[in-house]
Amino acid sequence: LADGGFATGTMMGSGGFIVLDEDQCVVKHTYTLARFYRHESCGQCSPCREGTGWLEKLLHKIETGKGAIKDIDLLWDVQRRIEGNTICPLGDAAAWPVAAAIRHFRDEFEWHVNNPELCLRENYGLAHYADELKVDAV
């Protein structure tokens, strides 16, 4: 199975895989993975320590409706600078899900950027972000 993931360019990190239906948000799940890897980084090498922090910050920005197209491009650049440049494989595992998500679902990232309020309303119900966005009275 892992070989198939490499062959299709869809590795989601450390050998695991996640199956999402069309109702799930790729950006939200990628952000969750980035948070995990940032937390797990020991901080010994700069590409992983700094890179995982940047991945988390940029994905949070996009997920919460504050992102721009340039943030998607920066995400791509950051993950490229992590992969292959760390002491242990955790950095690679952190970069792979971001690369796979952008490679296969860039349109969903762009949708988040171009429709922030709609995205939050449809995907997250605004309950978690109620203090950050102006919501129409019901």
Question: What residue spans do the PLM features occupy?
Answer:
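Redox cofactor-anchoring modules in respiratory/redox and cofactor-processing assemblies
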Residues: L1-V138
